[in-house]
């Protein structure tokens, strides 16, 4: 800061008023009175030091500053050339300790007007690079630049151990009408604990808040933000990232293993594994079981373990439960180096009311709507973002980009989209406000979701954005230019609900509910669907997937393998929650590890082996994955055999096909004639009743010859055995065809 840059000296009356506000911690323009200012033929330096009894200006030698005993304001008068810039202030506290500090108020503002303009327009996609806390060097002096958005604050201060958590010590500067406050504090380093102390301009209420843009936080139950170091992580996944740009996800197999990092596995005495340990152990396991992607329940920072991460307070911070941001980078990098994609759940639909978080951030409804009919989820006890506010939308868009860019995340599963789309979601009549057209659609949320998808797909080709949307809202996964929301995929909640409802019924009654399995194909290609058997289905008294199944133990496991056979051969990408792949018996509990001891039992080993081979089958046969989203990839053979509760269908890809036959009763269907599209020899390439998987080993010989008998509208047919509570996959044997290497053939009988 040159002499010409010194703030002009305020008039006496103005100065007196300003100092009164400063001392009372309600002043928005501390640079107006603190730091260096022209004074007569020289300059005056002022420092407000609430805990000092004596102070010196850092000239050579140091010169004592005059103290106003009433308010602890220290002044030094002198010639400009005698003052080094930047300069230090030395001060002694009541305990006799001397402190050496560069004066924050001798450094000019750092945020550009252009950055602030973009943020105000809601178009600063990388605003996380300027707001929050960032280690920087200003005029050769290292320190930390703090910036936050709080337009309804009268005063904002940075507080921490470095200033005894006293909001009088480091008041920030309000940047015009932008609502953004900033201050560079020299000498602070990464690892510093801090919060913002805000005083509301209307009520004078004081609010102590974590940093909305904080990139690291204390471990719960503590809530302070931590100044994060600039990353020095050296990524090794360049090849993966380049290939991702060309990833044809529409026509590639995607099989997702959904994971809660805190309860997948635990260490000694129930301790969390760290990101590095999880990377090595989880990647080895996913490679073994054959999934293509891992989807993480939210790793954004959150205060309550029991929320599973869905009540986020740190939208820019990997949770500190498992390690540092760089250790999370290692986790993602390690996955990529082994050919595994990483998706994460992201929660833009609501946020918690915790006092240290976003709620009433500056004493006003800043991030949320003020009217609870718009701004509160009463069922969940959370608040709803105000999507119509540019800066709030920018906050969320920047968060989404942050995870893709800083951590190389391959996609986001957007949580609770239905709650965003409908103004009357889970509300009684009279407890919601219609939109400007009188409807129940949340127009601002719709615009936000479209903008989110437009920005993410434009800036990061190949990245997936998946909607958890539980209603029949049209065109969720259709392009924006045709009126869609622009998501890559949508969870098929209808398939999940109908299928699990059907599978939970005693087989003797299933023939009455046959349409529960066939109905889904009426809309299966209306969206790009993912088939989810997620964490939500194995909690809150719903039971594990295994114990949703009826019958004795043998039948439960057979039903579970049958369910998985249907899932992996049905149109749509796949998602399976951890533990389901080996038949976890208990409901999921986030406070402890999965029951890995179950893999000591052959029947659980069998379920795991079935998942491994279904994954391999799905990934190896284009007929099972290429047209997951298109009707060209599916044909019924027979959907009408409700009397025997048998379904049969083709999955196809450009002339190649596989046949799937599913028997939903414990009665073996011997001499079951099935129409087929081509003559030749058929091979049974998967049988969920195989002894490999814990079944009864009923099935077919390794070759099945067609008969020239027209059947089910097909020119040829085969005579097969369909095992009890089982599914089989058949493939036409041709000279060019190769069976999947690890999918075992049933030995048959």
Curated annotation (Swiss-Prot):
Q: Name one GO molecular function term.
A: cation binding
What are the EC numbers? 2.4.1.18
Q: Which UniProt keywords apply?
A: Carbohydrate metabolism, Glycogen biosynthesis, Glycogen metabolism, Glycosyltransferase, Transferase
Could you tell me what reaction this enzyme catalyses?
Answer: Transfers a segment of a (1->4)-alpha-D-glucan chain to a primary hydroxy group in a similar glucan chain
Q: Name one GO cellular component term.
A: cytosol
What is the main EC category here? transferase
Matches recorded under InterPro entries: A-amylase/branching_C, Branching_enzy, GlgB, GlgB_N, GlgB_N_E_set_prok, Glyco_hydro_13_cat_dom, Glyco_hydro_13_N, Glyco_hydro_b
Q: Does the keyword Glycosyltransferase apply?
A: yes
Q: Which GO terms describe its biological process?
A: glycogen biosynthetic process
Q: In which pathway does it act?
A: Glycan biosynthesis; glycogen biosynthesis
Record's Pfam families?
Alpha-amylase (PF00128), Alpha-amylase_C (PF02806), CBM_48 (PF02922), GlgB_N (PF22019)
Residues the record marks as active site: 415 (nucleophile), 468 (proton donor)
What family, per the record? Answer: Belongs to the glycosyl hydrolase 13 family. GlgB subfamily.
Instruction: Describe the function of this protein.
Output: Catalyzes the formation of the alpha-1,6-glucosidic linkages in glycogen by scission of a 1,4-alpha-linked oligosaccharide from growing alpha-1,4-glucan chains and the subsequent attachment of the oligosaccharide to the alpha-1,6 position.
The annotated subunit structure for this chain is:
Monomer.
What name does the UniProt record give this protein? 1,4-alpha-glucan branching enzyme GlgB
Q: Which organism is it from?
A: Nitrosococcus oceani (strain ATCC 19707 / BCRC 17464 / JCM 30415 / NCIMB 11848 / C-107)
Q: What is the lineage of its organism?
A: Bacteria, Pseudomonadati, Pseudomonadota, Gammaproteobacteria, Chromatiales
Q: Gene name?
A: glgB
């Amino acid at each position: 800061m040159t002499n010409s840059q010194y703030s002009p000296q305020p008039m006496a009356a103005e100065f007196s008023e300003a100092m009164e506000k400063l001392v009372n911690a309600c002043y928005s323009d501390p640079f107006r009175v603190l730091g260096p200012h022209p004074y007569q033929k020289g300059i005056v330096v002022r420092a407000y030091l609430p805990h000092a009894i004596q102070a010196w200006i850092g000239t050579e030698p140091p010169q004592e500053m005059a103290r106003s005993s009433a308010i602890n304001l220290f002044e030094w008068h002198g010639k400009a050339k005698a003052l080094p810039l930047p300069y230090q202030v030395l001060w002694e506290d009541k305990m006799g300790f001397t402190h050496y500090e560069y004066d924050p108020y001798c450094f000019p503002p750092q945020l550009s007007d252009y950055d602030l303009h973009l943020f105000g327009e809601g178009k600063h996609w990388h605003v996380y690079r300027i707001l929050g806390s960032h280690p920087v060097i200003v005029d050769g002096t290292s320190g930390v630049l703090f910036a936050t958005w709080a337009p309804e604050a009268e005063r904002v201060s940075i507080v921490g151990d470095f200033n005894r958590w006293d909001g009088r010590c480091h008041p920030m500067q309000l940047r015009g009408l932008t609502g953004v406050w900033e201050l560079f504090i020299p000498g602070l380093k990464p690892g510093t604990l801090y919060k913002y102390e805000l005083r509301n301009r209307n009520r004078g209420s004081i609010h102590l808040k974590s940093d909305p843009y904080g990139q690291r936080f204390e471990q719960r139950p503590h809530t302070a933000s931590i100044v994060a170091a600039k990353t020095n992580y050296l990524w090794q996944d360049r090849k993966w990232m380049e290939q991702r740009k060309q990833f044809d996800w529409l026509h590639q197999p995607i099989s997702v293993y959904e994971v809660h990092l805190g309860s997948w596995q635990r260490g000694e005495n129930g301790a969390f594994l760290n990101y590095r340990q999880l990377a090595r152990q989880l990647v080895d396991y996913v490679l073994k079981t054959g999934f293509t992607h891992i989807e993480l329940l939210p790793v954004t920072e959150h205060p309550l373990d029991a929320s599973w991460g869905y009540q986020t307070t740190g939208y820019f911070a990997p949770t500190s439960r498992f390690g540092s941001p760089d250790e999370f980078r290692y986790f993602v990098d390690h996955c990529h180096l082994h050919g595994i994609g990483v998706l994460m759940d992201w929660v833009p639909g609501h946020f918690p009311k915790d006092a240290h978080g976003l709620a009433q951030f500056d004493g006003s409804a800043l991030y949320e709507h003020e009217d609870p009919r718009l701004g509160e989820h009463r069922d969940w006890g959370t608040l709803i973002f105000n999507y119509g506010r540019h800066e709030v939308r920018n906050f969320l868009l920047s968060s989404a980009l942050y995870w893709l860019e800083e951590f190389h995340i391959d996609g986001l599963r957007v949580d609770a989209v239905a709650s965003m789309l409908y103004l009357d979601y889970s509300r009684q009549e009279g407890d919601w406000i219609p939109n400007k057209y009188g409807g129940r659609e949340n127009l601002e949320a719709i615009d936000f979701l479209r903008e989110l998808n437009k920005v993410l797909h434009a800036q990061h080709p190949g990245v997936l954005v998946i909607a958890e949307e539980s209603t029949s809202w049209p065109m969720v996964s259709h392009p924006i230019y045709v009126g869609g929301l622009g998501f890559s995929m949508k969870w098929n909640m209808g398939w999940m609900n109908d299928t699990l409802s059907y599978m939970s019924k005693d087989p003797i009654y299933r023939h009455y509910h046959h349409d529960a399995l066939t109905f889904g194909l009426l809309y299966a290609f209306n969206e790009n669907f993912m088939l989810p058997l997620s964490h939500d289905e194995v909690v809150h008294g719903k039971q594990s997937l295994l114990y949703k199944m009826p019958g004795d133990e043998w039948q439960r496991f057979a039903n579970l393998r049958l369910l998985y056979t249907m899932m992996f051969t049905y149109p749509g990408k796949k998602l399976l929650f951890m533990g389901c792949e080996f038949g976890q018996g208990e409901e999921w509990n986030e406070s402890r590890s999965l029951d890995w001891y179950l893999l000591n039992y052959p029947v659980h080993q069998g379920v795991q082996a079935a998942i491994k081979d279904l994954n391999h089958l799905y990934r190896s046969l284009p007929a099972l994955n290429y047209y997951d989203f298109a009707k060209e990839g599916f044909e019924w053979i027979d959907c009408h055999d409700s009397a025997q509760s048998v379904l049969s269908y083709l999955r196809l890809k450009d002339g190649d096909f596989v046949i799937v036959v599913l028997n939903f009763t414990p009665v073996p269907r011997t001499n079951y004639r099935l129409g087929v599209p081509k003559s030749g020899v058929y091979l049974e390439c998967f049988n969920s009743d195989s002894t490999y998987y814990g079944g009864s080993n009923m099935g077919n010989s390794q070759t099945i010859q067609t008969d020239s008998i027209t059947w089910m509208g097909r020119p040829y047919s085969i005579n097969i055995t369909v095992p009890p509570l089982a599914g089989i996959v058949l493939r036409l044997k041709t000279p060019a065809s190769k069976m999947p290497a690890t999918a075992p053939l049933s030995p048959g009988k």
